[in-house]
Amino acid sequence: QMRDRLAQVSDQEFQRSRVEILSGLMRLRQICDTPALFMEDYQGASGKLDSLRDLLVQVADGGHRVLIFSQFKGMLEKIEQELPDLGMTSFKITGSTPAKERQDMTKTFNQGERDAFLISLKAGGVGLNLTGADTVILVDLWWNPAVEAQAIGRAHRMGQEETVEVYRLVTRGTIEEKIQELQEQKKHLVSQVLDGTESRGSLTLAEIREILGISEAST
């Protein structure tokens, strides 16, 4: 439905509907995590959560400790609910977590307490030195190289002696694959979609069509 609309919309109409269209892009990204982030009454499965669950079983069986990043607070909450069933304990930091709590949780985690650390994008770049982990899982699209490196860097710090394994979760056949394909050829475009700066007016109609795979012939 969104593709059909954007295939026909003019630049003038796009400018009038920019907020609505960009909100639609955000919903598509949330649905890639789990439709439950967008549909409150959704009771179905999530391929990404299923894959994450399988990966976390391997992490736990291998005696590893993990940092799990997501841009969406709701996704972190879903993951947090899954961990007890896997026999895993966790800490969680979001943008609203007070600085003192962050410091206390970071210190305790690095001393060996708990198995996982859930971190939101907004909180991930602020003074976190989590050398207690040897595995990093990027749940959402993080193909802005600077942001991805920053997330991985939470575990790569002075004193980290173990190799850090990094996993990215990509939902097949979705907008995530399209953005992955565009990573090298349009890094600035990918960055705007992932860090939210598209709302500032820099993302054009043509670029959104490219993300959604709408060809010029269909416009």
Language model region names:
Residues 89, 101, 105, 109, ...:
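SF2 helicase/translocase ATPase core recognition
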Residues 1-12, 59, 176-190:
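Charged, low-complexity, helix-prone segments enriched in Lys/Glu/Asp/Gln
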Residues 3-128, 198-199, 205-219:
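Conserved Helicase C-terminal RecA-like lobe
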